[in-house]
Amino acid sequence: MIGTARAAADVALRTAPGMMAVFVLVMLVEAMTPIAIAWLTKLVVDDLAGGGPVAELVPLAAALAVTGVLIAVLPQVSHYLGNQMARAFTARTTAQLFTATLRFAGLKPFEDPDFHDRLRLAQSSLQSGQSIVAGSFGTIRSSITLLGMVGSLLVISPVLTGIVLLTGVPALAAQLRLSRRRASLMWEIGPTERRQMFYGSLLGTVEAAKEIRLFNSGRFFRGRMMAELQNANAAHRRMDLRELAIEGALTLMGAAVAGGGLVWAVIAARSGALSVGDVSLLIAAVAAVQGALHNLVSGIAALHQDLIMFGHYVAVTRAGSDLPVPADPRQLPRLSHGIEFSDVWFRYSDRHPWILRGVDLFIPAGRAVAIVGLNGAGKSTLVKLLCRFYDPQRGSITWDGVDIRLVRPEDLRHRLTGLFQDHMTYDMSAADNVSIGFVAARDDRERIRAAARRAGIDDKLASLPRGYDTLLTRMFFEEDEADDPEIGVQLSGGQWQRTALARAMFRGYRDLMILDEPSAGLDPEAEADVHARTRNQREGATSVLISHRLNTVRDADHIVVLEQGAIVESGTHDELMTARGRYARLFNLQAQGYVEPPQAVVS
């Protein structure tokens, strides 16, 4: 926890050192004002009761007035400075947090529910980091006020002072326990809140709107969402009841001490042991000590909770890459021989079954290799390993003899381009959706259009209301722009497929092109067109094709059939058809769908 506090302080000092110095000064003066108010009030009351000269009373009254102004103004100043520091702190920590997520070169963290919970808590703790800094100074301010008022109270009654201070011990212990419980509660209800947000997002997204209305499942999802919300609320309610019981008991204890002190002071003043000013000072001092003690205890507890929460941020930002890279990484040569999988075994964790089992595969340079198989055969996983989104548990993948684990992942991916079946549809302009494939050339509009032409989508994008500057979404319009068709448009699934293909082509020539179901979701005419365009694009280049439609891979130089994570057949289309094995059976099964009426399935 000390390391977490140091991390927060380091960020704060680097963010706004000058503003922090002013903030500290204001808070120190603010801490002294209650002490000054109490003593000046005592002196004024005693002077009035004793009938002292006006010449002595006026300066005291003026000082009391100035202090009153300060006690009214300084909180506003510190609030302003605190807000400015908080914004600067949040901006810096947000940048650092998402810089850290970019250090994860693979996909493992993003497919881990625990990491999603930690990342969510890290994002919510960005404000906690600033609270740690402000809370630390607030604790110092409360300590100064407490010490000053304790000194004042000691002058009147050491016994009462001791009793008031002793009430802070159980309060501190109770608040620390509550802070730990609050922090652990945030982690415990993380999955519940994720499910609640999931169901809520379904009810508000256009992607799910069609099915929800067709299947009349809206009430079902709403019920699921509300059930998760109620579970989270129940957990919070139990926490609130615990806080109510503990803080109520502490408040009653403090009130009893203050009431007892007041009774004693009145009796002492009646007997002449205390002056009227002493009574006023005691009343102010007891209230101030209890207030400062409460603020101190609450501040320490809040600081403790914030430190626990900010620990999630520190954990994410200090985490190393999920893919190991040697201290002296190898340079990747231009692909001239080929890529080789040697006895590759892979599973997502020790709790999962093997996805790939002893795969031996050679992808010759300048050739097209197709990978086919049923769903779950391991095709997409093989591509993930090829892109080094994961490392195999056994075996190796070499690029012209160089193990890709000895190469920086970004250097490997610089040599790749591709189109994934689950490609992204960015809520950005048409130009951005293409140029995101190679952001270094995002301002080259002619290159963008050339890539779109090769993908067969240039005419469509150019004809949009604002051409390539048209937003491909309706998410960001203002209220008065809701009916303006020029603000944003929605592309069809096939048009998005071509836009994603243009994104891959925008990268220019790369050593390896990966095409994962490049014609999925297209009509027959569009499928034939995209197939011809991708064939021209990969002519003479090394490429890997994945498709369920075997007619689109028959012209590949080499076809590999995966089944249950292992290669069961390989060869050219003609060789595999002659062998009359699994490939031939699947190919003929698909072909029959075009020439013979489908047979009824009897269950």
Tell what function each PLM region has.
Residues 17-74, 150-182, 256-267, 271-277:
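Transmembrane helix-loop-helix hairpins at lipid-water interfaces of multipass membrane proteins
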Residues 387:
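Helix-to-loop junction immediately C-terminal to a conserved catalytic motif
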Residues 396-398, 431-485, 540:
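ABC ATPase nucleotide-binding domain helical subdomain, centered on the C-loop/LSGGQ "ABC signature"
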Residues 1-34, 54-60, 111-147, 195, ...:
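Membrane-integrated ABC transporters
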Residues 217, 285-318:
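Cytosolic ends of transmembrane helices, especially the final helix of ABC transmembrane type-1 domains
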Residues 13-14, 121-132, 191, 204, ...:
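An intracellular "coupling" helix at the cytosolic face of ABC transporter transmembrane type-1 domains
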Residues 466-469, 532, 540, 545-603:
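C-terminal portion of ABC ATPase nucleotide-binding domains
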Residues 119, 458-499, 505, 511-515, ...:
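ABC-fold ATPase nucleotide-binding domain signature/coupling loops
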